[in-house]
Swiss-Prot record:
This is UPF0246 protein SPH_1662. It comes from Streptococcus pneumoniae (strain Hungary19A-6). One of its GO terms (cellular component) is cytosol. InterPro entries: YaaA. The lineage of its organism: Bacteria, Bacillati, Bacillota, Bacilli, Lactobacillales. Belongs to the UPF0246 family. It holds the Pfam family H2O2_YaaD.
Amino acid sequence: MKILIPTAKEMNTDLPSIEAIPLKPESQAVLDALALYSASQLESFYKVSAEKAAEEFQNIQALKRQTAQHYPALKLFDGLMYRNIKRDKLTEAEQDYLENHVFITSALYGVVPVLSPMAPHRLDFLMKLKVAGKTLKSHWKAAYDETLKKEEVIFSLLSSEFETVFSKEIRAKMVTFKFMEDRGGQLKIHSTISKKARGAFLTALIENQVQTVGEARRLNFAGFVYREDLSQPQGLVFVKEV
C-alpha cells in the first residue's frame, strides 16, 4: 500500500540539512532544461516577482553545481497540508510507516519516499517546461508508473494535475478522498478545508498504521467522519459538522 502526497510551494529551510543523493536521469534532464532559463526568463516562467525569480535562479544553479542544501522532503515543504501532518516526535512504528508507505510526487524528483533529501525548488505539472521536446507529464509518465505498478492499493491525496501524470491503469487502482464541511445541512468544500484535512487524515493514517480501505473508513480525525451515503468504493468522503 502506498500513499501519495503532492509537493507544496511554501518551504522551510530553517532545518538541519542532510546529505544529497545523486539525481535520477529523469530528474537531471528536468534540471538541465530549467537551468537554461535566465533569472528574467524565470520571472515570466514562474509568474513571480524579479526578486523571487532571482532566488529561484540561485536555487536551480546551486542544484546544477551540486552545492544545494538538501532537507528531508516532509520537513522542507511547509504548506497548509504539511503543517497539519505529524512530523515530529514520531514513534518507531510511525517512522517505519512513513518510510514504507508515504511517497511524495514531484515534478523534479519523481515519486520518492517522503523523507528523501530534496533541495528547495519550484516546479509543478502545470508549468510549461519542455524536457527534450516533451511536457513534464509525458517525460515522467513511465517512471511514475514504474514506481507503483506492483501496488494493489494506492491512496491518493493528490490534486488532479498530479494524478493525470499516471496512466489509466495506475489511476484505476487509486482510492481518492474528499473532505467537506457540513454547515447547517449545506455541504461545503474549499481548498483551505481540503489542505488542512489532508494533513490531519495522513496523521490519522500514520498513527493508526492504516493498511486497507476498510480501516481508513473507520477513522475519526479533526472532527471528520466517513460518510458512506456520499462515498463510492474508491472515492471516500469525510464530513465535519461545524
